[in-house]
Amino acid sequence: MSRNTQSESGISSLQAKAEQTVFYYPPKVYSSERGNEVLYFAPDQQVVVVVNLAGQDVLKAAEEGGTADEIALRLSRGDRELGGGIQQLVRPFLDEMVKRRFLSKEPFANEREGRPSPERASLELSNLYLHLTDACNLHCVYCYNACQRTENIAQRRSGAKGIRELSDEEIREVLDDAAEEGIGTVVFTGGEPLLRNHIFNLADYAREKGISASLLTNGTLIDREKAVRIADLFDNVIVSLDSWIEAEYATLRPGAPLHQVWDGVRHLSEAGVQSLAIRPVVTSLNLASLPDFPSIAKEQLNCTRFYPAVYLPNSPGELETLGLFPDPETYWSTLASFFKALDEVDGTSVKDECKLSGAGACGAATSLLSISASGDVYPCQSLHLDEFWAGNVRKQSLGEILQDSPALKAFRENRWPWFKPCSECSLMAICSSTCRVFQNVFEKRQDLFFQQMCPFFKRECEHRLWREVDKIRLQFVSSGTPLSRG
């Protein structure tokens, strides 16, 4: 046998083997169409791919699995006239999808059933929310902890024991513990943290312990002198400022005029704060004015960093009575206009890169903790509730609470949705609705949750996935090829 004959025989053998290669489709997939493109998300594989309509045809034919010939045959049985060379078009596409890890040449492992394992919620504590005081000079209509703060203040005035705010010395002890536990950032919050006496001394102490200090403030109490101190002590400052329109601000955050916080932000900018950001809570009331905010903030405040946060109801009743929750489609289309306007002024925003795994990427009890003004420890600043109480720093060190608290351990080991439809959804891995706050608020009104909240979170997931498109874009064939829809 000649060398050419042997070579040809080897090639034929490889070709025959390739022809018998079986392609497997992921067990769980979410798809979203936009114009002539289709996005596919495989959560178990943590993969996103984008194809055109012809690619969608091939993937539909591949759902049952099979060889390239079998998949091409399913295509040819479709309701369209297909040109020749189907095999030549299909096989390279399938191979590319394997390369992208969307398809596989080996059977996928059985779909993960039930709940994520506790290991997925391992402790990597990095952020501590430290509530310096329950006092606040504003009366925001949507405040998530107003009732608790008001109750705590009333109990202190009545002389109730154990409810007093932590002293400066006790806060220093907390900061000592935080440093020992490797916590890198402490967020000074409240109430309004600038109402706390000696806040600057406490921030300075945190820096001495090697901890980065951040400030979350409503901005109404900042004059030029305070702005300079803040710039010296805090690495990050976030100012809650919902609107540049007086009437909107007054309705959402009564208690101080808009110009007061406007001046505060300007003072911070002039003082040279290292990282200064505006956080508007976006509601149905101020949504329409949001796209104009970046240019106005740059011109008048020299601030172009924004952390927009959508208003989320604190109870089912609030969802029905306040009417502040925005329409999902209107919200996301307006947010797109906002980001475009932000780009035009060279602004920046909180990174919304899509984390493709991690049960919604909630950091409660794992990467963050929260301590109330009276020393109670909770898994999250939005979960200061009795059922999630982990201990008190007056009775135990922070390290002891982290190690011994049944509440924190249970929270970390039970990071799965309480709502059955959520656990069956292909978007669960990236969906914000798996946050325990929402599951807790709507536990007894799941009907309302799935009617009004679920569509919003679904649209959010799609928004985040599509923002990944430029990184993972995969165009199958141009519109003139035999497999296109024409």
Task: Tell me the role of every PLM-derived stretch.
Residues 81-84, 88-96, 100-104, 109-229, ...:
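Conserved alpha-helical substructure of the radical SAM core
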Residues 2-3, 8-14, 233-236, 240-377, ...:
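Radical SAM enzyme [4Fe-4S]-AdoMet core and its adjacent flexible, acidic
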Residues 135, 139, 143-146, 365, ...:
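Cys/His-rich metal-chelating microdomains
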Residues 70-80:
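DNA-recognition alpha helix
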Residues 136, 140, 375, 398:
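Conserved, mostly hydrophobic/aromatic
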Residues 3-8, 384-486:
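Flexible mid-to-C-terminal extensions adjoining Fe-S/redox cofactors in radical SAM and related proteins
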Residues 60-70:
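Short capping segments at the starts of secondary-structure elements
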Residues 1-61, 482-486:
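Acidic, low-complexity/disordered tracts enriched in E/D and polar residues
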